[in-house]
Amino acid sequence: MGFSSIWHWIIVLVVVLLLFGAGKIPRLMGDVAKGVKAFKKGMADDEDDEAASVSAERRGIEDGKPAQTIYPPQQPQQPQQPPQQPPVHRDDAPRG
């Protein structure tokens, strides 16, 4: 007895209607549709951005100019010396 019986699907449908109500289901489906549309739009925007960057790279190659890599400015680093500890003076004279 799997979920291939029509009675199982009717029971599932009734439970879903009882949990969410008849008015909430269309709103949920509308929200899902909006989410899918936003996802597709985002994917299309990413593809457009990628295509624009590829075409910009090709224009640079077509112009005969090598692509320039911009590096952030770096501060010169000076070698650090380990901290010097002050010498320890012992008093060799016996105490007492």
Swiss-Prot record:
Basic and acidic residues bias: start-end ranges: 56-65
Subunit structure: The Tat system comprises two distinct complexes: a TatABC complex, containing multiple copies of TatA, TatB and TatC subunits, and a separate TatA complex, containing only TatA subunits. Substrates initially bind to the TatABC complex, which probably triggers association of the separate TatA complex to form the active translocon.
Annotated spans, Disordered: 42-96
Species of the source: Rhodospirillum rubrum (strain ATCC 11170 / ATH 1.1.1 / DSM 467 / LMG 4362 / NCIMB 8255 / S1)
Record-stated family: Belongs to the TatA/E family.
Protein name: Sec-independent protein translocase protein TatA
UniProt entry tagged with the keyword Nucleus: no
Topology in the lipid bilayer: Single-pass membrane protein
Gene: tatA
Keyword line: Cell inner membrane, Cell membrane, Membrane, Protein transport, Translocation, Transmembrane, Transmembrane helix, Transport
Coiled-coil region: none
Compositional bias (Pro residues): 73-86
GO molecular function, one term: protein transmembrane transporter activity
Bilayer-crossing regions: 1-21
UniProt subcellular location: Cell inner membrane
Keyword Transport attributed: yes
A GO CC term assigned to this protein in UniProt: TAT protein transport complex
Biological process (GO), any one: protein transport by the Tat complex
InterPro entries documented for this protein: TatA/B/E (IPR003369), TatA/E (IPR006312)
UniProt superkingdom: Bacteria
Function: Part of the twin-arginine translocation (Tat) system that transports large folded proteins containing a characteristic twin-arginine motif in their signal peptide across membranes. TatA could form the protein-conducting channel of the Tat system.
